[in-house]
C-alpha cells in the first residue's frame, strides 16, 4: 500500500516526525506533503488563483507554501502523476485534540477531508496535550500515539464497515489509555455554546497610527455534558474515533421548514 502523510502543524513539526516513525515499515511507499509553516485552524481553505510554491525534498517529499488542504491535494496530484495514487492519506499527528467545536476549524481534519473529497480514504490523528499550549511541544507526551496509532489504522483498513466512506478522526489522550471508543463530536446536538478561542489583545502605535493586534491562543473545545461525546470520552482517557461526513445540514430544522411547504 502507498500512504501519503500530511498535516497542519508543518512539515518539520514533531507530530509529523512521530507519524513518520509510526508508519515506517508498514507501507510499501510513504510520501509526505505538508505545509511549510504552522497552519493550525486553517480549516478547508484552498489557495485559489494563487501560485503555490512547493519545494521537493527528495522524490516523495513536498514542502508546500500553502494550506493543509493545498498540501493534501498537491501530494495526491504528484503521486497520481507518477501512476501512484495513494491508497490512504493520514493527516497528523496534530499537536492538540480536535473535538467538539474545534472540528470545523481544524486544518488536520481539513487535509484529510480534502483527500476524501477526491476519493482517497483518509484518517486524521490528533494528540491531546497536557496543560496550556507552548512552543516546541514541551508539555506533550507522544508515547500514547506511538503505541496506539498504527494498530488503529490497521484496524480501520481491515474494517469493511468503514471502507473509506468518511473521514475517520482519531483523538489520543495524554493520560493513561483506558481503551478505544467511537463517538460523535460534542456540538452535534446544538446545546453547547462556545465562547471562541482565548485571545490576547495588544495596542500598537505605528507610523500609520494606532492599531490593535489580536492573538488567538487556545482553540480547545468546551466540555460537554454528554458522557458519550468525544470531548468527555477523551478527558476520561479513551482514544476516541469519530466518523466525519460531508453533510452540514441541520436536518431537524430542515424537516420543520419542509413541513410548511
Curated annotation (Swiss-Prot):
Residues that bind a divalent metal cation: 8-9, 40, 94
Assigned keywords, A-Z: Cytoplasm, Hydrolase, Metal-binding, Nucleotide-binding
Subcellular location: Cytoplasm
Gene Ontology CC: cytoplasm
SUPFAM superfamilies: SurE-like
Pfam entry (one): SurE
An annotated Gene Ontology molecular function: metal ion binding
Cofactor(s) required for function per UniProt: a divalent metal cation
UniProt remark on cofactor binding: Binds 1 divalent metal cation per subunit.
Highest taxon of source: Bacteria
Substrates-to-products reaction catalysed: a ribonucleoside 5'-phosphate + H2O = a ribonucleoside + phosphate
EC number: 3.1.3.5
Catalytic EC class: hydrolase
Annotated function: Nucleotidase that shows phosphatase activity on nucleoside 5'-monophosphates.
Entry similarity comment: Belongs to the SurE nucleotidase family.
NCBIfam families: surE (TIGR00087)
Protein name, per record: 5'-nucleotidase SurE
Species name: Anaplasma marginale (strain St. Maries)
Lineage of origin: Bacteria, Pseudomonadati, Pseudomonadota, Alphaproteobacteria, Rickettsiales
Amino acid at each position: 500500500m502507498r500512504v501519503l502523510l500530511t498535516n497542519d502543524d508543518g512539515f518539520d513539526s514533531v507530530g509529523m516526525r512521530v507519524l513518520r516513525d509510526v508508519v515506517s515499515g508498514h507501507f510499501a511507499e510513504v510520501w509526505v506533503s505538508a505545509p511549510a509553516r504552522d497552519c493550525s485552524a486553517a480549516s478547508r481553505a484552498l489557495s485559489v488563483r494563487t501560485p503555490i510554491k512547493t519545494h521537493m525534498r527528495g522524490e516523495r517529499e513536498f514542502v508546500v507554501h500553502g494550506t493543509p488542504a493545498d498540501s493534501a491535494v498537491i501530494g495526491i496530484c504528484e503521486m497520481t502523476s507518477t501512476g501512484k495514487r495513494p491508497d490512504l492519506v493520514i493527516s497528523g499527528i496534530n499537536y492538540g485534540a480536535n473535538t467538539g467545536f474545534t472540528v470545523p476549524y481544524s486544518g488536520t481534519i481539513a487535509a484529510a477531508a480534502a483527500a476524501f473529497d477526491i476519493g482517497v480514504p483518509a484518517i486524521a490523528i490528533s494528540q491531546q496535550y497536557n496543560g496550556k499550549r507552548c512552543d516546541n511541544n514541551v508539555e506533550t507526551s507522544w508515547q500514547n500515539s506511538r503505541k496506539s496509532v498504527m494498530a488503529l489504522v490497521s484496524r480501520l483498513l481491515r474494517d469493511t464497515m468503514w471502507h473509506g466512506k468518511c473521514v475517520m478522526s482519531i483523538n489520543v489522550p495524554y493520560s493513561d489509555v483506558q481503551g478505544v471508543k467511537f463517538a460523535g463530536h460534542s456540538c452535534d446536538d446544538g446545546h453547547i455554546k462556545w465562547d471562541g478561542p482565548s485571545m490576547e489583545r495588544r495596542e500598537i502605535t505605528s507610523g500609520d497610527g494606532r492599531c490593535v493586534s489580536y492573538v488567538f491562543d487556545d482553540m480547545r473545545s468546551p466540555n460537554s455534558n454528554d458522557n458519550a461525546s468525544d470531548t468527555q470520552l477523551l478527558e476520561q482517557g479513551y482514544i476516541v474515533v469519530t466518523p466525519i461526513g460531508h453533510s452540514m445540514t441541520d436536518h431537524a430544522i430542515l424537516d420543520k421548514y419542509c413541513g410548511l411547504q
